Amino acid sequence: MTPPVKCQVAESNYHGYHGYWASDFTKVDPHMGTLQQYQNFVKEAHEKGLYVIQDIVVNHLGDYQQIKKDISANDFVEGKAKVSESRFYLEPKSVPFSHPEQLPWALNNINDLTYDEWKHNSFYHYNSEISDYTNQTNMYTHSSSNLDDMVTESEVVRNLLRGYFRYWIDKTGIDGYRIDTALYVEPEFFEGFINATDASNMGVREYGKSKGKADFIDFGEAF
């Protein structure tokens, strides 16, 4: 099923009704229903002998930031980024918020971006769209369809995403994940996201097993 997470509703001429423009990974989007309805859906599916596979995104959030050219050290004056409509800026038509609601991404605001934050403490790749699909670094660190690309090589991001997606297993009893845009995330991310056995921060497959789902399913989209 499509991602049920709370999303950016719209930006400019496009809309996030489909569930792939996350704003908060642990809330149900109002137009999808409620958590209780989702729980009932999974329960009824199981009673009919069906598995429920939830679609998820670990590559990007919504389109809150417009980045037309990769941000570089030259874009900072006295330690602060020079916001420019020709290069990078916060999307003014984002609805209902101008930035994600969830940490850590809510901490980064391109309008207040400092050099130190960009260089050492950013949870976004402040780069333009993918330009070379034969270059893995370009694919992993640039945006797909202009959607804000997460720094999935960050341990902070990796640890939080594991927890955010254990949440749905715990709350609803789903049977697996179909991982959207998996081709644009470095393979090392998935080793921990899926298989980590640390009891304090399990990967999603291991967590599924701990909940009695020996066959918890994970597979990715690649195109």
For the regions a language model picked out, list residue spans one by one:
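Short, surface-exposed helix-loop/turn micro-motifs enriched in polar/charged residues
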Residues: 17, 48-49, 178, 207-210
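Acidic-and-aromatic substrate-binding clefts and catalytic sites of carbohydrate-active enzymes
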Residues: 31-34, 182-188
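Short catalytic-loop micro-motif centered on adjacent basic/acidic residues
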Residues: 53, 176-180
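Substrate-binding/active-site clefts of carbohydrate-active enzymes
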Residues: 3-167, 171-172, 192-197, 222
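Aromatic-lined carbohydrate-recognition surfaces of secreted/lumenal glycan-active proteins
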Residues: 53, 61, 185, 200-223
